[in-house]
C-alpha cells in the first residue's frame, strides 16, 4: 500500500488535516535535484537547507510516522513522491526501505535515519576490513523488535546451525549470513565457504518448500509466518529493534534538536506519572518502589505526618508498582499519562 494512503487512514490524520495543510510542496524534478547535487548544507538554494531527515517505509512505517508526529515534525507527502518538506523546520524527509537507509546515512548524504539494527549490522558487515562505519547508533526507539534467525523445515533432521555447513542457505542478509557461517566453519570472513549462500529479496520463507534451500536466514517477529511456512528457528544471528542513527560526518545543529524531541516522545511512551499519598513514616520504603528517573517529587500535605509523592514509573511495571504501594500504606494512588517530555 502506498505510504500516503496508510498515513491518511491512520490515527495521525488530524495532524495532516490541520498543520500539514500549508506545507511546501516539492516536485519530482526538485527531489532528484536535491538528492543528486553535491551535498552542501550551506546551500541557500536548497529547499531544505540541504538538511535531510531520513525515515523508512515497511514494517517500521506507522510507528515512525507516530514518532515524527509526536516530535512536531509537520509535513505533507505528495502521492508517488519519496520526499516531503517539513513545514516548521528546514528539513526534508525521505521515505525509503529500511535496508537502504544505512548506506545513505553512512555516506553522509543525510544526517539522521530511522531503520532496524539488523539493517545497520548488514551494512557494516559489508564494509572492507578496517573501514570504520559512517553510521552511528544514537538511540534505541523501542519498537519493531525482531530476530534474524536461522530456520529449517520443522519435519527435517537439522536441529542446529552447524548441520547446514556445506548446504544451501537463502537469505536477504547475505553479509551477516556469511559472517555467521564463517564463524561456524572456522574461516576468515570473506574467504570461500563450503556453505552456499544465495540472495533472495523477498518471500525468503518459501525457499525451503520450493527446494531452493536447506535452510534460510530471515527476520522473525511473532513467528507466525515461520510456523505457517513449516519452519522452525534453530539459531539467532542478530536481535534487532528500530534505532535512530546519524551520520558520523554530520555537523548540523538540528541533529541535537531532533534527537532531543524524539527522546522526549520515547520517554513519554515508556513512562507514566504515578502520584500517591503516604504517611511520612512509610516514605523511605515507598521511594524505593518509585525512585523515578532521578528522584521522586515529595510535597508535604496539610494533614500532619502525610506527604504526596509524584514519580515517573515504567508503563509496563505500573500495575505491580501500584500493588506494592498499597502494601506499604500508600493511598489515593493515581496514574497519569505523559503527553511529551524533555528529560536528562
Kindly give the residue locations of the regions a language model identified:
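Extended cationic-aromatic binding surfaces that line active-site or macromolecule-binding grooves
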Residues: 102, 111
